Design a protein with these regions (language model features):
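N-terminal accessory segment detector
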Residues: 1-126, 153, 157-159, 165-169
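Short, non-transmembrane amphipathic alpha-helical segments
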Residues: 130-144
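Conserved short beta-strand edge segments in small beta-sheet-based binding/regulatory domains
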Residues: 145-150
Length: 169
């Protein structure tokens, strides 16, 4: 890492360990194949996911599979025992550096926090969907609330807004 911090990398029988945490290498082509090939499988799609993932700028034929990947990656993080401590000054840059950067998912930038809404920008790259899913998981863990995520695809990346799903929170 660029801050001179050393990470302990170990090869395991299945995958890798980074500082004692299990990690796996996922080929970008695998994620693309999942997104492109699973769009037609809507029989078991939970329609309530449309309430928590609001996506604009992406072709409709890919929305179902993208939402499933987003939700899966968020749930994968939520199933972990990783703590996220958000200070009063919204230290999202530190959270991104410690929870995303070491795993190759650091191409996200915190833009603003106001009125309970956090805004992020994610670069347009092969990991973008994974990054968005995990940042939403980080947000939910840090805030202790279920979220709704608004995703807008632009020419250069994704603009993300995350807020509480429930209006009284």
């Amino acid at each position: 890492r660029d801050k001179g911090q050393m990470l302990m990398l170990e090869k395991r029988s299945i995958g890798w360990g980074i500082n004692g945490k299990s990690s796996y290498v996922l080929p970008c082509d695998m994620i693309n194949r999942i997104i492109y090939n699973s769009g037609g499988y809507t029989d078991t799609y939970n329609k309530s996911l449309d309430d928590v993932w609001q996506i604009h700028g992406i072709d409709n034929r890919y929305l179902t599979s993208i939402v499933c990947v987003l939700q899966s990656f968020k749930q994968l993080f939520m199933a972990s025992d990783v703590y996220v401590f958000l200070s009063e000054n919204n230290n999202w840059s530190e959270i991104i550096n410690s929870h995303l950067g070491p795993f190759g998912l650091g191409s996200v930038k915190h833009i603003d926090t106001s009125n309970g809404i956090d805004e992020f920008a994610v670069e347009l790259n092969a990991n973008a969907i994974l990054i968005i899913g995990k940042i939403v998981g980080l947000w939910e863990r840090a805030n202790g609330k279920q979220s709704v995520c608004f995703i807008d695809l632009t020419d250069t990346g994704f603009k993300i807004k995350i807020e509480s799903l429930l209006s009284y929170n």
